[in-house]
């Protein structure tokens, strides 16, 4: 079912509540990476260019105490947004109450305000975690501040919070529209097409430490993928399931039987490393060597090896749809980063394919290589994109009105 999009709405003179994802790394008031702020710009600009009054809501980090409040204010985000928009942005140091209401009442068409961190509602109240547990009264209150609601926060789409599901539910109950922003629309389009209607050959690349994090993705994508390439720590659970020696490598002993079942179900679709970069300990400075698919007892696998890279490249060269989630090794250490970087290069070399990257380390690799412009879509949601690839319904998308 097609969702209502911000561009379907008449925004002139309207108070537009926008749930954005401004959950950016901040230390001592300094933003480490403003990508999520930049990703929200198309929706914000569209609203103000069409005469709407943009009222922005976001969480930032996990708020457990008053001390966290000092570190996790959205004030630096509002200042950065003002620089990016090249116009004043008003920051309101509350997200409920008289100051919020008076500031909104004074807004003119095209104005932008940022309310304080929604998760400040998770402490100092009788309900408990009002935001994270979706207190309906909080959702109703926020909904009362606006004429329309736009959800543009894919990063929290897998969570049912007051600031997404709560507002949307109250809006629809009041006969007001709840629409998707352009970022959410883009995520739905790219991930939805990949999961539901991929152009073949469709190759899934999965990495990261744990099989348990990706079980749902593998099960959902076995029937849809032509190949599933597996690297990272999770590969050693699969290699153990095949009877290979894995030395001191990270693996999940309680998931070996499950890995056997997945291998049986997938047939030859699952492709595992044929060689590995192994070291005596988990350290960049440890002696390391390339070994085959059996790892010596005193060593651990920390990256895919050069033959595996070539095998993966050979499969990828014919792909028309590629989804990549998770690193191929201990990417944070230069000596074990090459497998991840090579997979990134292979994706960048594809000319006529839809390429989608999700997950922090895969995204970081794309940025390190400078290949982001060559990738069709880099997802802004870690957990949300995994849930989508599992075929789960995401509350933050389900709550948006259908067209």
From Swiss-Prot:
Keywords: ATP-binding, Cytoplasm, Glycolysis, Kinase, Nucleotide-binding, Transferase. InterPro entries: Phosphoglycerate_kinase, Phosphoglycerate_kinase_CS, Phosphoglycerate_kinase_N, Phosphoglycerate_kinase_sf. It is an enzyme of class 2 (transferase). Coiled coil: none annotated. Its EC number is 2.7.2.3. Substrate binds at residues 21-23, 36, 59-62, 119, 159. Pathway: Carbohydrate degradation; glycolysis; pyruvate from D-glyceraldehyde 3-phosphate: step 2/5. ATP binds at residues 214, 301, 332, 359-362. One of its GO terms (cellular component) is cytosol. It catalyses: (2R)-3-phosphoglycerate + ATP = (2R)-3-phospho-glyceroyl phosphate + ADP. One of its GO terms (molecular function) is ATP binding. GO terms for biological process: gluconeogenesis; glycolytic process. It is found in: Cytoplasm. It comes from the Bacteria. HAMAP family: Phosphoglyc_kinase (MF_00145). Belongs to the phosphoglycerate kinase family. Monomer. This is Phosphoglycerate kinase. It comes from Lactobacillus gasseri (strain ATCC 33323 / DSM 20243 / BCRC 14619 / CIP 102991 / JCM 1131 / KCTC 3163 / NCIMB 11718 / NCTC 13722 / AM63). The gene is pgk.
């Amino acid at each position: 079912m097609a969702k209502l999009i911000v561009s379907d709405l008449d925004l002139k003179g309207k108070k537009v509540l926008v749930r954005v994802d401004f959950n950016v790394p901040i230390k001592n008031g300094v933003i480490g990476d403003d990508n999520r702020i930049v990703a929200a710009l198309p929706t914000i600009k569209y609203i103000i260019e069409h005469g709407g009054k943009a009222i922005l809501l976001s969480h930032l980090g996990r708020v457990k105490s008053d001390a966290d409040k000092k570190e996790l204010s959205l004030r630096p985000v509002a200042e950065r947004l003002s620089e990016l928009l090249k116009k004043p942005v008003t920051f309101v140091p509350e997200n409920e109450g008289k100051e919020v209401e008076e500031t909104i009442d004074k807004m003119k068409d095209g104005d932008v305000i940022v309310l304080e961190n929604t998760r400040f509602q998770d402490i100092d109240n009788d309900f408990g975690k009002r935001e994270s547990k979706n207190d309906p009264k909080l959702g109703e209150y926020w909904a009362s501040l606006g004429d329309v609601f736009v959800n543009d926060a894919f990063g929290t789409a897998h969570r049912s919070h007051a600031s997404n599901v709560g507002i949307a539910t109250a809006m629809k109950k009041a006969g007001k529209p709840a629409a998707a922003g352009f970022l959410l629309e883009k995520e739905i389009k790219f991930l939805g097409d990949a999961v539901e209607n991929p152009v073949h050959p469709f190759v899934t690349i999965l990495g990261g430490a744990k099989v348990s994090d990706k079980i749902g993705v593998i099960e959902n994508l076995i029937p849809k993928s032509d190949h599933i390439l597996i690297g990272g720590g999770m590969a050693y659970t699969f290699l153990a399931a095949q009877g290979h020696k894995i030395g001191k490598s990270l693996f999940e002993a309680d998931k070996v039987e499950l890995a056997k079942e997945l291998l049986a179900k997938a047939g030859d679709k699952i492709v595992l490393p044929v060689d590995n970069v192994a070291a005596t300990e988990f350290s960049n400075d440890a002696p390391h060597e390339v070994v085959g698919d059996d790892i010596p007892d005193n060593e651990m696998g920390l990256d895919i090896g050069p033959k595996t890279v070539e095998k993966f490249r050979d499969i990828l060269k014919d792909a028309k749809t590629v989804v990549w989630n998770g690193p191929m090794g201990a990417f944070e250490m230069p000596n074990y980063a090459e497998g991840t970087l090579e997979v990134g290069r292979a994706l960048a070399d594809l000319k006529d394919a839809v390429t989608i990257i999700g997950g922090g380390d895969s995204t970081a690799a794309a940025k390190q290589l400078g290949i982001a412009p060559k990738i069709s879509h880099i997802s802004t949601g870690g957990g949300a994109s995994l849930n989508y690839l599992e075929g789960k319904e995401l509350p933050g998308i389900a709550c948006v009105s259908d067209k």
